[in-house]
């Protein structure tokens, strides 16, 4: 999916490449470098199985970095939680390690909708207002779960990579820090409830949106 900006006009174009990761990445790079090759600002957004991204087309991701491409790569169905029935090839648990090797790739592993919105807004500002030659890699899940309201004042922490999302303070004696990102964060919240209710141990929950 890509959005092209020409002056004050905006157009939206959808492309479905099929089982053609190399071709899809090539299309994304072409759109992501159109600002310098054709003097046309575009916002390419490429969605794929997260396992079929850096693991299969890591050389193209490097090429995107070398060519100063701008845009968003969305590693969908990440976290090893929902596609086990389709085989191990769909279970991604390490794409962020690969993404971290590219200096101008900014990676995030959000859990909730407001985190994703804050990251997208900042990415658009950095790439298309500040003209930074970077691109974003963001992993998302396809689990069905409730999303909480955005805590006040958390935007800066989301962008920096970590913020406190919940505080389980009841017994005021033992307190531990629980850190989670992406698919595992909701399990951290469940673990905090068990620790407090069954073991009288308080905790703080931190959403780690990025280790990048």
Model-identified regions with their sequence ranges:
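A generic structural signal for short, well-ordered alpha-helical segments in conserved domains
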Residues: 189-192
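Acidic-enriched catalytic cores of C-N bond-cleaving enzymes acting on peptides and small amides
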Residues: 198
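Single conserved hydrophobic/aromatic residue that forms the stacking wall/gate
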Residues: 1-7, 11
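Conserved thiamine diphosphate
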Residues: 9, 13-179, 183-186, 203-211
């Amino acid at each position: 999916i890509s959005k092209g900006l020409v002056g004050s006009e905006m157009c939206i174009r959808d492309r479905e490449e099929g089982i053609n990761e190399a071709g899809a990445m090539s299309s994304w790079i072409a759109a992501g470098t159109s600002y310098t090759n054709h003097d046309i600002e575009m916002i390419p957004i490429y969605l794929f199985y997260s396992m079929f991204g850096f693991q299969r087309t890591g050389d193209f991701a490097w090429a995107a970095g070398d060519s100063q491409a701008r845009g968003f790569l969305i590693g969908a169905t990440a976290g090893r939680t929902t596609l086990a029935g389709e085989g191990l090839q769909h279970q991604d648990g390490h794409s962020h390690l690969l993404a971290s090797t590219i200096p101008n790739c900014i990676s995030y592993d959000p859990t909730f909708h407001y985190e994703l919105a804050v990251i997208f807004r900042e990415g658009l500002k950095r790439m298309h207002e500040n003209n930074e030659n970077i691109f974003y890699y963001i992993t998302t899940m396809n689990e069905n779960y409730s999303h909480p309201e955005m805590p006040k004042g958390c935007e800066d922490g989301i962008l920096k990579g970590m913020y406190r999302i919940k505080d389980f303070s009841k017994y005021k004696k033992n307190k531990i820090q629980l850190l989670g990102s992406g698919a595992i964060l909701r399990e951290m919240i469940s673990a905090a409830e068990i620790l407090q209710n069954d073991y009288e141990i308080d905790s703080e929950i931190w959403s780690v949106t990025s280790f990048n």
